[in-house]
Amino acid sequence: MPRKTSSQPRPAEPKAVLHPRNRHSGRYDFPKLIAACPELGEYVILNPYGKQSIDFANPDAVRVFNRALLRQFYGIQHWDIPAGYLCPPVPGRADYLHGLADLLAADNAGVIPRGAAVRVLDIGTGANCIYPLIGHREYGWRFTGSDIDATALASARTIVAANRLDKVIELRRQDTSTQLFKGILAADERFELTLCNPPFHASQAEAASGSQRKWRNLGKLDPSRKLPKLNFGGQAAELWCEGGEAAFVARMADESVAYAKQVYRFSTLVSKGGNVAPLMVRLQRLGALQVQALDMAQGQKKSRFVTWTFLDAAEQAAWRTERWPRS
């Protein structure tokens, strides 16, 4: 018997919302953004709905837009990145940090621990240094960022120095591409959090294909317009690694065991939903505790981060008593 179909339109799925503390809910106020960063005015266009926007397929427009967001919302006066390096979406990066703050608050009677006593390690901080900038401005946390790319680190150092954040953001070079924590964490160091935005793809060709797909989804692929030329030499470590995201986060899980007593909460973004369950199973087999996958959403995009610890309840309580500021 044929299946009945309804003539009634399906209700649209509710649009995912940002974290309640995220400063970027609602439409962007372009007049205010332009007031904060006048050069943004050169890139503002009207979208098909007659609203002010920018051309998100134009790398220069996106770069200046990010500069305006960081200046207006976080007081970051000086920010730039070299051509060809990732220009991250600020709202999504902020959401990850707010989610991590909630994790700490859940262990601290609902109070987010703030200030430089809270140390955070950003694995692969990149040329943009986005997590340390936002995390320090929002919560006063002290960051250490690591990267294997000398050009990316030089860019990040320029940003940190220009904004006089040298005392709260430290940058370290990772000399071995197969290592994440080793070579960065000293034996006597402890961190409340680690965070990471892993490479997504398994090869340069896959990364290039993904970028082509991105521009098509933006509706910018047409015969009269060339796609942006991507500099994969500079972006390689940001976009792909052998085995892709699944192999990267598995390596992170394995390596985290050696630093079990030095980190309160490990975490990593996981972009591909299919990589979550294998990572969680691996962590549990390694003896990790409180293994969680926490969902995030920005508009139509859904993502999540996985977090874990090796500290039992008594060790966590002792850590908080010793290190966290009392409210």
UniProtKB/Swiss-Prot annotation:
A Gene Ontology term for the protein's cellular component: cytoplasm
Keywords on record: Cytoplasm, Methyltransferase, rRNA processing, S-adenosyl-L-methionine, Transferase
GO MF terms, alphabetically ordered: 23S rRNA (adenine(1618)-N(6))-methyltransferase activity
Classification via InterPro entries: METTL16/RlmF, rRNA_lsu_MeTfrase_F, SAM-dependent_MTases_sf
Protein location: Cytoplasm
UniProt organism field: Stutzerimonas stutzeri (strain A1501)
Coarse class of the protein's main subcellular location: cytoplasm
Alphabetical list of PANTHER family matching this protein: RNA N6-ADENOSINE-METHYLTRANSFERASE METTL16, SAM-DEPENDENT METHYLTRANSFERASE
Function, in words: Specifically methylates the adenine in position 1618 of 23S rRNA.
Start and end residues of each stretch annotated as Disordered: 1-24
Catalyzed reactions: adenosine(1618) in 23S rRNA + S-adenosyl-L-methionine = N(6)-methyladenosine(1618) in 23S rRNA + S-adenosyl-L-homocysteine + H(+)
Gene3D superfamilies referenced in this protein's UniProt entry, alphabetically: Vaccinia Virus protein VP39
Top-level lineage group: Bacteria
GO biological process: rRNA base methylation
Upper lineage: Bacteria, Pseudomonadati, Pseudomonadota, Gammaproteobacteria, Pseudomonadales
Protein's UniProt name: Ribosomal RNA large subunit methyltransferase F
EC numbers, comma separated: 2.1.1.181
